[in-house]
């Protein structure tokens, strides 16, 4: 199951799992036309897998529960859940440069509802099937904003929660041989975002595929509950962006990742009495809206 599959990292993940890994992927989103085009792309790729498109509003708990019941009834097991649905980018982009008290409350809700809460609900409903099978992997798609101020209060709070969601779920799932991890891509090149040298949706999809198909039990046991980085997974499991074969882009991304890893390796600023507060204008100013040019084309 891949949520948020109409665009961005969710769409790329669904496509790679079906076309390159041969999975039967239940791809969920609210936009039927986008799901149908994804289904067509996968069918035309001549891969061994398939995409089952499911129009689903993740704010509707009963609809989500009914969807999981249908999948559980028709499939022997659910091997993988990727929680990628997130409405925060669309919600926050028109308000760059404003502090949280000048932004609509709906900006916070965009990150928390179709983001953290949606991931929690879907995971809670899928977990029983995985526990019964004594096997399964849950992946949350998150961001460096989980451990440093980036863009918006809601953005940071939501991604910190996503990181913690995997850790605490893994703690309770470990005795059942079910794993939960968080995946941190860097900035992306998607329908919404335009980060320079950003990661493509298919690159992130290959990171998920590596965890599901290439990682052995020893690695997954150690990774359980942890936050993993796409560029490091690319080096470990030998995948790359389309057209990049010499490893130079992966290496550049690993090097660019280091400052963020340094932050995450230290005691987080909120737990360090002597740590200075960041300057919000470093990442929350009107110029940053240019990194999200596609946000205006979608509704929250």
Predicted regions and their residues:
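Rossmann-fold cofactor-recognition segment
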Residues: 42-61
């Amino acid at each position: 199951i891949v949520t948020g599959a109409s665009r961005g990292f969710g769409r790329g993940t669904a496509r790679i799992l079906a076309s390159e890994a041969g999975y039967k992927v239940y791809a969920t989103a609210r936009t039927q036309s986008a799901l149908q085009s994804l289904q067509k792309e996968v069918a035309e790729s001549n891969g061994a897998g398939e995409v089952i498109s499911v129009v689903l509003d993740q704010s509707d708990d009963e609809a989500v529960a009914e969807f999981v019941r249908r999948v559980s009834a028709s499939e022997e097991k659910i091997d993988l859940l990727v929680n990628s649905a997130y409405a925060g980018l669309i919600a926050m982009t028109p308000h760059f440069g404003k502090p949280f008290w000048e932004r609509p409350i709906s900006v916070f809700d965009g990150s928390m509802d179709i983001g953290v809460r949606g991931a929690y609900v879907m995971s809670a409903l899928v977990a029983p099937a995985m526990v019964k099978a004594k096997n399964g992997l849950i992946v949350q798609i998150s961001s460096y904003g989980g451990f440093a101020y980036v863009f918006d209060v809601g953005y940071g709070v939501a991604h910190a929660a996503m990181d913690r969601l995997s850790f605490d779920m893994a703690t309770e799932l470990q005795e059942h041989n079910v794993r939960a991890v968080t995946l941190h891509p860097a900035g992306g090149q998607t329908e919404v975002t335009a980060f320079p040298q950003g990661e493509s949706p298919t690159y992130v999809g290959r990171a998920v595929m590596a965890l599901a198909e290439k990682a052995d039990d020893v690695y997954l046991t150690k990774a359980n509950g942890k936050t993993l980085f796409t560029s490091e997974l690319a080096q470990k499991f030998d995948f790359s962006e389309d057209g990049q074969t010499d490893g130079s882009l992966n290496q550049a991304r690993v090097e660019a990742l280091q400052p963020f890893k340094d932050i995450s390796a230290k005691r987080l600023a909120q737990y360090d009495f002597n740590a200075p507060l960041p300057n919000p204008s470093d990442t929350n100013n009107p110029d940053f809206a240019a990194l999200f040019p596609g946000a205006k084309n979608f509704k929250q």
